[in-house]
Amino acid sequence: MLSSLSPHLSNVRQTLTQVLNFALVLSTAFMMWKALSIYTNSSSPIVVVLSGSMEPAFQRGDLLFLWNRSPRAEVGEIVVYNVRGKDIPIVHRVVRAFGDDARDPKEGGGKKGKSASGTGKKESVAAGAVHSDSSFVSHKLLTKGDNNIADDTELYARGQDYLDRKVDLVGSVRGYIPAVGYVTIMLSEHPWLKSVLLGLMGVMVILQRE
């Protein structure tokens, strides 16, 4: 009887080993992500460009590496910010920067001027979330996509004329790898690909057991 159960027990042990190995891979990846998040001071230190509003600087599918430990963002710097009230992080360039106090630029920090005029806009959206740190001073920013006609005022939350460095920014772009994040775009635009990948993973597990 024990001899007849032995193959089944062996299969169970093999399955448990594969599950534990998979869990170990996931937990290791999660710990590496959290460590990178702490090091960069950004809750989303790596993001993928999902639209063409920053062309030619960045293309869809480019993988961006962020840094969020600088107290200021300078004019010309490319940043990722979060739209308040929406889970829509956007990759755009700083075109105006206002002082280090919390006053409205219209009242005490200078009048805000738009860098361009027009109506048509595209958003360079990236996967990620906003992260703030109380050590940052208040710093107001106006952003714009390089491939857009107008600045981002219409993209901001209602009643918001500029970004707050402390509240809205996910981080500043410090490096990138072209195109490697395009698989993220494919999975978001074609949900059926997720099912195909899961099916392939299941087949691989079965083949490994054999």
UniProtKB/Swiss-Prot annotation:
The lineage of its organism: Eukaryota, Fungi, Dikarya, Ascomycota, Pezizomycotina. It is found in: Endoplasmic reticulum membrane. InterPro entries: LexA/Signal_pep-like_sf, Pept_S26A_signal_pept_1_Ser-AS, Peptidase_S26, Peptidase_S26B. Its EC number is 3.4.21.89. Residues 101-124 are annotated as: Disordered. Glycans are attached at N41. GO terms for cellular component: signal peptidase complex. The chain crosses the membrane at residues 15-31. This is Signal peptidase complex catalytic subunit SEC11.
